[in-house]
């Protein structure tokens, strides 16, 4: 808004991923609608377009706009020039075109414009690859894109099988998960952001724009339970291609914690000293240092998602099963190693209870699938190792004095004294997943007592501000490359 103070409200157009920002002033009301056009599944025509439509709802509104693109995170130069259709920004790293009917002026590497809208009028701005020219920016053309995109999202969401009391929240969550999918490959990224801090002004600003095996598996759980089997099938295809080229030799194992959407290795983590993240939070990072970590828990999350896909989706192929057996063979030889686990600590590997839990899940689910489908496997070895894992978790992961399962197995080195309860017993919220993965039952008397005590301890620890997540406060050493909690809602088997 060009003149005066404005009140802002932001929301999604109902049952869509069209973002609406409403600005209210004494002179009128204007809406800014941001969306990526999507008119049909696998819509190649609009894959790299971002549309911003400004609509005056009431009054007469003077507006200003500006665009300041930076190539290669501000490390590559570019030149801006005015064009008949708007402006173009070109350099060695690529070229962008801003198409609009609003007159623009170029100032250095940026472009600006002023315009006034009366009630019922609109202006559109379309940002896309300069090599593409996928349509005009007239009011009618952009209206067609808007209506088509709204229809697509509502049609997609109509496939949801959820009709409970939390419909609005569940559907908003699954719409977000859909935004994180890469349709050409089937990959599911963890988040579309970098430079978004855990705390405003803090240092923990990570690059999340990759496929974390763990997070993608959690997303798959949610999609399957809601009835979106096509997305689950596409991710399983991505995973199958990944396993086909996985190397099972070496201590690093056949799986990495994270990959690019193409299934390739993630770049080295680089600090962008010249840039700031959200609200001045610095430093910004590109790439992710967790790429070389050993995170044994991902085998459990991955195989559990395959188990659910086999149960609710199309079912896995024999070829995919043989790949999983190869994966499991490696895990059976390495499951008792220290690792960085779900919290991706950078202070050295530990014997994490959560990793043992998910290794148990991996073997237990393979046994289930083999029996249910009659698939071949070394069930004797699998079950013996599974039972060894179970005993270790119960005997070394439980602290009787603290009344809780602990983050690390005994004997272990716990330096985080201020985060400990009952001596060396550091509480880990990830272990609250135990009943969800069928390790313990909160209703069967033999195991419910431990579970209830552990849950109560976790609740007390969290409410007293001592973190239940992991080694966060002491010598942080960039302890975790992410802050997302496990998306565990809807875990039912």
Language-model segment annotations:
Residues 1-493:
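Acidic, mature catalytic/reactive cores of soluble proteins
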